[in-house]
Amino acid sequence: MVAQSGVGTVSTKQARIAELARQMPGKAMCSLSHHMDQAWLHEAFRQTRKDGAVGVDGQSAAEYAADLGNNLRALEPRAKSGEYRAPPVRRAHIPKGDGSETRPIGVPTFEDKVLQRAVVMLLEPVYEQDFYDFSYGFRPGRSAHDALEALDRGLHELRGGWVLDVDIRSFFDSLDHEKLRQLLRQRVTDGVVVRLVGKWLNAGVLDGGVAVRAESGTPQGGVISPMLANIYLHEVLDVWWVQEVQPRLRGRSFLVRYADDFVMVFSEQEDALRVQRVLAKRFARFGLTLHPEKTRLVPFCRPPKSGGRPHTGSFDFLGFTHTWGRSRRGNWAVRRKTAKGRFTRALRTINQWLRSARHLPVEQQAIALGAKLRGHFQYYGILGNSVALSRFHYEVRCLWRKWLSRRSQRAYVTWDQMNRLLARYPLPPARLPWRSRQLWLANL
């Protein structure tokens, strides 16, 4: 009952925080944590995902929820008094791109996730008044598809141009703790909030049973990490771009950022080269390094109407490879398809799951595979990507047949048998759930 009755109270408090932040641009908010009462913590619990992996204490969401009232009543005074000790995060490694590298993910304890969510709920209404419209990552009411839509519209308005495709090396592991604290205190000086953020930055990680204290970085996977990343890059990149870079450019330009993944687009090559030269120096001042091989300037000008094949490059952004292609009316339009690395990684993940689940009943496999396919199509199902979606659907069917054939020495499944199985347990077809939002592209 506390959680349900407190939702309206929490949203009202957040609206007040937002209004104060809007009335005091550039000034520090010194009183936020008094809002973090039991209703606030119950709402933070409600918003916290319950299906995630467990942290170093091994406690699941269900186990924490079994005594939720007492747990939250004990958490509030510890969080506000400074007695709360942030536990180290459990480190896991997941493959990146084509699998040649891995990305470290930090898994906090469930209680830590709840408290981090509560602090995010305090910071969000403040920083939403400051963040620019071209920033899309981990913000309320914004998504990766919104960022892709903004990029498409900008490219068509500029008729292409020069794309600075930027890759920050190990961004989440490279955040300078002291600089992050300084940037945070420019807008928030509430002692409880600043202290809790400091505890999370200093908590360290448990990697393979070995405790490691990190002097920089914030673990990916933490609830607070995306907010801290946005605060950092808002000052390091966004404000710099708006106040110092764009006023000095000769031509038109725009920036689209999703967390640490961003592209800059310029109508003039000279502008692009100038920014490319100074960007690395700017980032180095804040402890960040650009990947020398993955950061590149891509010619992406729209070909002439009467021209043949475009003599331009391509670039990847948010899992899609962007190129120029012909629309249904024969005009040039930006085309997007699933990036090769993402395609390969998604298939590898399904292959690994099928291997581990090959002895489950076929009906259970079909249900799980259907959910995985729907998730893939939900993200990659955009206009112009139907070929990649159909191919992915076909490859998944092939993988399923392969692992069904390996259930035993006598379990070989022919394609006739597989087709009968698919008729009984059909997988969801390749769909374009984002088609309606992008029909304007098809009519160019």
Predicted features by range, described:
Residues 1-444:
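Non-catalytic terminal/accessory segments
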